[in-house]
From Swiss-Prot:
Transmembrane stretches, start-end: 34-54, 93-113, 130-150, 195-215, 216-236
The protein's name: ATP synthase subunit a
Annotated organism of origin: Nostoc sp. (strain PCC 7120 / SAG 25.82 / UTEX 2576)
Compartments where found: Cellular thylakoid membrane
Function recorded in the entry: Key component of the proton channel; it plays a direct role in the translocation of protons across the membrane.
InterPro entries: ATP_syn_F0_a_bact/chloroplast, ATP_synth_F0_asu, ATP_synth_F0_asu_AS, F0_ATP_A_sf
Length: 251
């Protein structure tokens, strides 16, 4: 019985969170496996874009049809969250976020990264690393600050005392909680999904984890949609003109 337990304790230990392939660049210590899988995801997106645009047809088919559908979906999402007048410049940013997160999430389930052995750690979805999700959340924060300042200038700070002045500390705290919630929600969901599927694959036959993997693909797509939707909503909120709305209501 002891030998049986020891047999299963070895592979389960390999699922330990925190093992990384480190790259030392000067004084910086980088997570190498995150860069490798991120470059893979970027390469997939670039190849798909080139394939879709190299031979454009009036009646789209194949990869062109798929990417045109994705573009229309992202454009509608941005229009609904940001507004019809302001959304167009932000479609590339929101679309890049959505597609990168979507492909990253799915790569962890569909690409056999586990077959590639590294000196330390293992290859997983880029979004299962907190550094990736924090970087995406900080980019979103910079984007909505830029959106607000580009439209309102210093008047953007007026949002911090709307509708009443004592909202100022709560609005400042909100600026910190937005990237925190974005990053930890995405990181937690993707990491948990990979760990659950990994444990099930070790403990039970192949076909038993398949429903869990299918559910993981669905939730991964939903997480990409949630992140992109919230990013667009924050940008729209930063550019929202409260004074303009009040003026229209009086008329």
């Amino acid at each position: 019985m002891l030998n049986f337990l020891n047999f299963y304790s070895v592979p389960l230990a390999e699922l330990e969170v925190g093992k990384h392939l480190y790259w030392q660049i000067g004084n910086l210590k980088l997570h190498g496996q995150v860069f490798l899988t991120s470059w893979f995801v970027i390469g997939v997106l670039v190849l798909a874009s080139v394939a879709a645009s190299s031979n454009v047809k009036r009646i789209p088919s194949g990869i062109q049809n798929l990417l045109e559908y994705a573009l229309e979906f992202i454009r509608d999402l941005a229009k609904n969250q940001i507004g019809e007048k302001e959304y167009r410049p932000w479609v590339p940013f929101v679309g890049t976020l959505f597609l990168f997160i979507f492909v990253s999430n799915w790569s962890g389930a569909l690409v056999p990264f586990k077959l590639i052995h590294l000196p330390e750690g293992e290859l997983t979805a880029p979004t299962s690393d907190i550094n990736t999700t924090v970087a995406l959340a900080l980019l979103t924060s910079l984007a909505y600050f830029y959106a607000g300042f580009s439209k309102k200038g210093l008047g953007y700070f007026g949002n911090y005392v709307q509708p009443v002045s004592f909202m100022l500390p709560f609005k400042i705290i909100e600026d910190f909680t937005k990237p925190l919630s974005l990053s930890f929600r995405l990181f937690g969901n993707i990491l948990a999904d990979e760990l659950v599927v990994g444990v099930l694959v070790l403990l039970v036959p192949l076909f038993v984890p398949l429903p869990v993997m299918a559910l993981g693909l669905f939730t991964s797509a939903i997480q990409a949609l949630i992140f992109a939707t919230l990013a667009a909503a924050y940008i729209g909120e930063a550019m929202e003109d409260h004074h303009g709305e009040e003026h229209e209501e009086h008329h």
